[in-house]
Protein backbone atom coordinates (compact mmCIF):
# COMPACT_ATOMS: atom_id res chain seq x y z
CA UNK A 1 0.00 0.00 0.00
CA UNK A 2 2.99 2.28 -0.23
CA UNK A 3 1.73 3.00 -3.75
CA UNK A 4 -1.91 3.52 -2.81
CA UNK A 5 -2.50 5.77 -5.81
CA UNK A 6 -1.96 2.69 -8.00
CA UNK A 7 -3.14 -0.08 -5.66
CA UNK A 8 -6.50 1.35 -4.63
CA UNK A 9 -7.94 1.79 -8.15
CA UNK A 10 -6.75 -1.73 -9.03
CA UNK A 11 -8.39 -3.19 -5.92
CA UNK A 12 -11.58 -1.26 -6.62
CA UNK A 13 -11.73 -2.51 -10.22
CA UNK A 14 -10.93 -6.09 -9.22
CA UNK A 15 -13.75 -6.05 -6.68
CA UNK A 16 -16.10 -4.59 -9.31
CA UNK A 17 -15.20 -7.52 -11.60
CA UNK A 18 -15.66 -10.01 -8.72
CA UNK A 19 -11.98 -10.93 -8.68
CA UNK A 20 -10.73 -12.08 -5.28
CA UNK A 21 -8.20 -9.68 -3.80
CA UNK A 22 -5.44 -9.87 -1.22
CA UNK A 23 -2.57 -7.77 0.04
CA UNK A 24 0.55 -8.47 2.03
CA UNK A 25 1.46 -5.67 4.44
CA UNK A 26 3.37 -4.77 7.55
CA UNK A 27 0.64 -2.25 8.27
CA UNK A 28 2.98 0.74 8.44
CA UNK A 29 0.70 2.99 6.39
CA UNK A 30 -1.85 5.66 7.33
CA UNK A 31 -5.04 4.11 8.71
CA UNK A 32 -7.18 5.88 6.11
CA UNK A 33 -5.23 4.17 3.32
CA UNK A 34 -5.58 0.72 4.89
CA UNK A 35 -9.24 1.37 5.67
CA UNK A 36 -9.98 2.32 2.07
CA UNK A 37 -8.16 -0.76 0.77
CA UNK A 38 -9.91 -3.07 3.24
CA UNK A 39 -13.33 -2.47 1.73
CA UNK A 40 -12.08 -4.07 -1.53
CA UNK A 41 -10.16 -6.98 0.02
CA UNK A 42 -10.98 -10.61 0.64
CA UNK A 43 -7.78 -11.49 2.43
CA UNK A 44 -4.92 -9.71 4.20
CA UNK A 45 -1.51 -11.15 5.04
CA UNK A 46 -0.34 -8.92 7.90
CA UNK A 47 3.20 -9.24 9.25
CA UNK A 48 3.78 -8.60 12.95
CA UNK A 49 7.46 -8.80 13.77
CA UNK A 50 7.54 -7.69 17.41
CA UNK A 51 5.07 -6.60 20.11
CA UNK A 52 7.53 -4.45 22.08
CA UNK A 53 7.93 -1.08 20.36
CA UNK A 54 11.51 -0.47 21.54
CA UNK A 55 12.60 -3.90 20.29
CA UNK A 56 10.69 -3.35 17.05
CA UNK A 57 12.46 -0.02 16.54
CA UNK A 58 15.82 -1.63 17.28
CA UNK A 59 15.21 -4.40 14.76
CA UNK A 60 13.43 -2.50 12.00
CA UNK A 61 14.21 1.17 12.47
CA UNK A 62 10.60 2.14 13.29
CA UNK A 63 8.29 1.68 16.26
CA UNK A 64 5.24 -0.54 15.99
CA UNK A 65 2.52 1.72 17.41
CA UNK A 66 1.01 2.49 13.99
CA UNK A 67 1.28 -1.14 12.90
CA UNK A 68 -0.50 -2.53 15.97
CA UNK A 69 -3.09 0.25 15.93
CA UNK A 70 -3.86 -0.50 12.28
CA UNK A 71 -4.12 -4.23 12.93
CA UNK A 72 -6.49 -3.71 15.86
CA UNK A 73 -8.68 -1.36 13.81
CA UNK A 74 -8.66 -3.73 10.84
CA UNK A 75 -9.77 -6.67 12.98
CA UNK A 76 -12.44 -4.62 14.74
CA UNK A 77 -13.87 -2.53 11.91
CA UNK A 78 -13.77 -5.28 9.26
CA UNK A 79 -14.92 -8.45 11.10
CA UNK A 80 -15.78 -10.25 7.84
CA UNK A 81 -12.34 -9.71 6.33
CA UNK A 82 -10.00 -12.65 6.83
CA UNK A 83 -6.66 -11.51 8.20
CA UNK A 84 -3.71 -13.87 8.44
CA UNK A 85 -1.11 -12.52 10.87
CA UNK A 86 2.35 -13.86 10.15
CA UNK A 87 5.60 -13.57 12.03
CA UNK A 88 8.99 -14.40 10.59
CA UNK A 89 10.59 -15.94 13.69
CA UNK A 90 14.03 -14.34 13.92
CA UNK A 91 16.65 -15.68 16.35
CA UNK A 92 17.28 -13.27 19.22
CA UNK A 93 14.51 -10.91 18.09
CA UNK A 94 11.11 -12.57 18.51
CA UNK A 95 11.86 -16.22 19.19
CA UNK A 96 10.84 -16.01 22.84
CA UNK A 97 7.80 -16.82 24.95
CA UNK A 98 7.30 -13.18 26.01
CA UNK A 99 6.64 -12.17 22.39
CA UNK A 100 4.34 -15.15 21.78
CA UNK A 101 2.21 -14.52 24.88
CA UNK A 102 1.92 -10.79 24.07
CA UNK A 103 0.82 -11.49 20.50
CA UNK A 104 -1.65 -14.15 21.64
CA UNK A 105 -3.23 -11.68 24.07
CA UNK A 106 -3.40 -9.04 21.33
CA UNK A 107 -5.21 -11.42 18.95
CA UNK A 108 -7.55 -12.86 21.58
CA UNK A 109 -11.24 -12.38 20.86
CA UNK A 110 -10.95 -11.85 17.11
CA UNK A 111 -12.56 -14.61 15.06
CA UNK A 112 -11.47 -13.23 11.68
CA UNK A 113 -7.76 -13.74 12.23
CA UNK A 114 -5.44 -16.67 11.72
CA UNK A 115 -1.83 -16.86 12.80
CA UNK A 116 1.28 -18.42 11.33
CA UNK A 117 4.80 -18.43 12.77
CA UNK A 118 7.24 -18.58 9.86
CA UNK A 119 10.65 -20.16 10.57
CA UNK A 120 13.65 -17.92 9.89
CA UNK A 121 15.51 -18.68 6.66
CA UNK A 122 18.37 -17.16 4.72
CA UNK A 123 16.68 -16.93 1.31
CA UNK A 124 16.97 -13.14 1.19
CA UNK A 125 20.75 -12.95 1.53
CA UNK A 126 21.26 -12.50 -2.22
CA UNK A 127 19.31 -9.24 -2.06
CA UNK A 128 21.91 -7.88 0.35
CA UNK A 129 24.70 -8.97 -1.99
CA UNK A 130 22.94 -7.27 -4.90
CA UNK A 131 22.61 -4.04 -2.90
CA UNK A 132 26.25 -4.30 -1.73
CA UNK A 133 25.07 -4.25 1.88
CA UNK A 134 26.32 -6.46 4.70
CA UNK A 135 23.99 -9.21 5.87
CA UNK A 136 24.03 -8.61 9.62
CA UNK A 137 22.51 -11.96 10.62
CA UNK A 138 25.61 -13.86 9.50
CA UNK A 139 25.21 -17.61 9.79
CA UNK A 140 22.50 -17.45 12.45
CA UNK A 141 19.92 -20.22 12.28
CA UNK A 142 16.69 -20.94 14.12
CA UNK A 143 16.86 -24.07 16.27
CA UNK A 144 14.38 -26.82 15.42
CA UNK A 145 10.99 -26.47 17.06
CA UNK A 146 11.21 -22.76 17.95
CA UNK A 147 8.67 -21.56 15.36
CA UNK A 148 6.34 -24.39 16.36
CA UNK A 149 6.66 -23.37 20.04
CA UNK A 150 5.80 -19.74 19.22
CA UNK A 151 2.84 -20.94 17.12
CA UNK A 152 1.57 -23.14 19.96
CA UNK A 153 1.86 -20.38 22.59
CA UNK A 154 0.08 -17.82 20.39
CA UNK A 155 -2.69 -20.30 19.55
CA UNK A 156 -3.19 -21.38 23.17
CA UNK A 157 -3.07 -17.83 24.53
CA UNK A 158 -5.63 -16.51 22.08
CA UNK A 159 -7.82 -19.58 22.53
CA UNK A 160 -7.60 -20.77 18.93
CA UNK A 161 -7.56 -24.38 17.89
CA UNK A 162 -4.30 -25.06 16.03
CA UNK A 163 -6.22 -26.12 12.90
CA UNK A 164 -8.16 -22.83 12.84
CA UNK A 165 -5.00 -20.77 13.05
CA UNK A 166 -3.56 -21.78 9.69
Name each region found by the language model.
Residues 105, 113-114, 128-154:
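A structural motif corresponding to the C-terminal lobe/cap of the Radical SAM core domain
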Residues 78-83, 99-100, 135-148, 166:
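A broadly tuned preference for mixed-charge, low-complexity surface segments
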